[in-house]
Amino acid sequence: MIITVTCNPSFDKTLEVPGFAPGRTLKARTLHRQPAGKGVNVSRCIAALGGRSVATGFLGQGEIPIYTSSFDQLQAVVDFVPVAGDTRQNVTIRDPERNAETHLREEGFSVAPADVAALERKLSELAAPGDVVIFSGSLPPGMQPADLARLVRLCAGAGCSVAVDSSGPALAEAVQPGVWLAKPNRDELEELVSRAVQSDDDVRRAAAELRETVEILLVTLGDDGAICFANDRAWKAAVKVDVVRNSVGTGDAFLAGFIVAHLEGQPPETCLRRAVACGAAATQELWAGQIDPAIVEKLLARVTLAEF
């Protein structure tokens, strides 16, 4: 089973505002609104690829029915810990005149120690040997990086393969012995090793340090693709797309693709190719957390892969 953990979920709202500029009164057209958050996006992409998952974490108690109904048609189960307060809203403002996007991120609800303890109990119930548990995204106010590290240890101790996709102190605390996979981008890799990472050799040296802790390291490079370090080898994969329709959630699609391929028994380099194709496919959709398997297969044929 795949378990996605989203501690700081959101509702993603997309507005279209031609000629957007601050300090003015402008008309906006609502294009889309959906339950989101990084782990939620991963679950949605896993479902698109034919996989099953359980989506858990924290959620404003009033929004649980909305999240549940949004997953009714997917091969995913919603099992969140309800907390007081409202789930945050993330707003993307699209300006078609400038072909530009502006992203606004609310802080959202706060969690109490009792909420963290409830999530710990939830994961104790859900996690079983052989499961893959994915911790994705930021932490809500009130939750400390040490809390995340404790949840990671709990799942690893239960015999699960733990994947971490976060940033800042939360990522630094979570990347610890027993973690199966970590997915930093270049900036996050610099944070983890506390120095600049610019050249290929810089990436290799940083990866060598982290590979003492994690089994698989995925370093995402945006338009330049991604690098996978595993089994004392490394590969770099990339694919070009002509038009990017959406940039939100591409890393979540990437991670979903890697995990699903891994559970199919594919070797790391094949998982990387699938992940890169999924991330690129996500740029062809209007909304985060959506990929078309047919587009994934077309892009997969164009993915370049080389030893790194």
Please place each PLM-identified region on the residue numbering:
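Positively charged, low-complexity intrinsically disordered leader regions
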Residues: 1-24
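Hydrophobic anchor at the start of a short beta-strand
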Residues: 2, 52-54, 78, 162, ...
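Substrate-binding N-lobe of the ribokinase-like
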Residues: 27-87, 299-302
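Short beta-strand scaffold segments in enzyme catalytic cores
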Residues: 44, 91-93, 225-229
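Conserved phosphate-binding/catalytic loop of the ribokinase/pfkB sugar-kinase fold
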Residues: 92-129
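Short beta-strands and strand-loop turn motifs
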Residues: 103-105, 130-138, 165, 183-188
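Conserved phosphate-binding/catalytic region of the ribokinase-like
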Residues: 172, 200-308
